[in-house]
Design a protein with these regions (language model features):
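Structured soluble/peripheral alpha/beta segments that form catalytic or ligand/cofactor-binding pockets
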Residues: 1-396
Length: 396
């Protein structure tokens, strides 16, 4: 596969829907997964987020962000916006969070913009970049001809002093057709509320870590959401043969009333699923399975060998099942660490809405993939690496 396929005509733009105060939220999100030589069953992971929001003010993990201006779009589709670049790094033992949390203005443009380098060839194919206007290189972009993505990041000095790497540089090349072709979803519910999402499910990644090069994989998404954020489960797995699996289960739960980041609340005892789904790019069968049925069970790790997060809380185990008329997949995965982002946004009459967004590097304990050709298990793969999300509260 010589280039990344798909429609990237709006990948570098967020003016798809008119902004809604306190509800519009935009971001690019990249997750890089590389092997952990000390714990082969785990993976080291880097997450980077470039984000902006239509809001008078919001507190992000204790830091108040007050936008200095609204998003501006020029006549050529270039965007300048206030926002933040946020990141975490998990080295297989310790979670460095936030690895970076930096306020800045960001410029985003595509290869049709007059400011795109003149020497770049193959214009109009969706190449582009988001460029934070900072002294450090914190850029993320797609090279001309859609040959590869790049990402550059410099860690906060306080995290470097604690043992985090200083500089990260990632090149992401296409893997194979199904996971490395951008998938687009857009849905408008009414009153301009809805979502606009584009994903590249699987890429080969080369991570340069303070001069050391490591081969792994990457997941990329660009999201615009214009609706209240409700509790959800989401997760994904990359397999050594290039297969990709994900699951998503938004749910109605008393956990939407939670106001802090403490897990295992008694309010999180009941979850009513709301349109769960899943997707499996199956490399060995050379096909894609879509699932409209999904269940997610959450339980604490207990007993010898159970793991805890940096705050001492027991980490979860997820039991996930997705199925359709041909294929059924059941997995048991446990979190090996936890990164959390805590959002508090003033609303009306002095009320404050809250969302805790947790990200968990995963270790796969069991997997069963059953279809018309037989049963596959974890033993059929050299490695499986992944990440899961669990969010509670409601942000509006």
């Amino acid at each position: 596969m010589e280039k990344i396929e798909g429609d990237f005509s709006t990948f570098w733009r967020f003016d798809i829907l008119p902004p809604i105060n306190r509800l519009s939220w935009w971001w690019w999100w990249v997750l890089v997964l590389v092997p952990d030589p000390n714990h082969p069953e785990r993976s080291r992971q880097l997450m980077v987020l470039w984000s902006s929001k239509e809001t008078p003010a919001i507190r992000v993990s204790g830091h108040w962000w007050i936008p200095k201006s609204r998003m501006l779009v020029d006549e050529d589709g270039g965007t300048v916006m206030s926002g933040m670049v946020c990141a975490w790094w998990y080295d297989g033992e310790s979670m460095f969070e936030p690895l970076l949390m930096k306020e800045c203005r960001m410029a985003a443009l595509d290869d049709n913009h007059p400011l795109w380098p003149e020497e770049a060839t193959e214009k109009g194919q969706g190449a582009g970049a988001v460029i934070p206007l900072t002294s450090e290189d914190l850029s993320f972009g797609l090279r001309p001809g859609r040959k590869s993505f790049w990402l550059n990041l410099s860690s906060d000095e306080n995290q470097v002093a604690k043992g985090a790497p200083k500089n990260f540089s990632v090149t992401m090349n296409p893997w194979w057709e199904r996971p490395s072709t951008a998938k687009y979803k857009n849905n408008v519910f009414g009153l301009n509320m809805g979502y606009d999402i584009q994903r590249v499910h699987g890429m080969k990644a080369t991570l340069n870590l303070d001069g050391e090069e490591i081969e792994g994989s990457a997941y990329i998404q660009k999201v615009g959401v214009q609706a209240p954020s409700i509790p959800w489960f989401w997760g994904m797995l990359h397999f050594d043969d290039g297969s990709y699996l994900d699951w998503f289960m938004p749910h109605v739960s008393p956990s939407f009333t939670m106001k802090d980041d403490t897990p295992w609340s008694v309010r999180d005892f009941f979850r009513s699923p709301n349109a769960g789904s899943g997707l499996f790019h199956d490399a060995s069968r050379n096909r894609t399975e879509n699932f409209k049925r999904c269940t997610v069970e959450l339980e604490r790790q207990e007993g010898e060998g159970s793991l805890r997060d940096e705050q001492g809380n027991l980490l979860p185990r997820f039991k996930v099942k997705v199925w359709n008329g041909r294929t059924q997949i059941s997995i048991h995965v446990r979190a090996t660490s936890r990164a959390r982002w805590v959002f508090d946004q003033p609303t009306r009459a002095g009320f404050v809405s809250h969302l805790t967004y947790n990200e968990y590097p995963l270790e796969v304990e069991k997997i069963a993939i059953l279809d018309e050709q037989g049963l596959r298990s974890v033993d059929d793969y050299e490695w499986i690496r992944g990440n899961a999300e669990h969010a509670w509260g409601i942000l509006n």
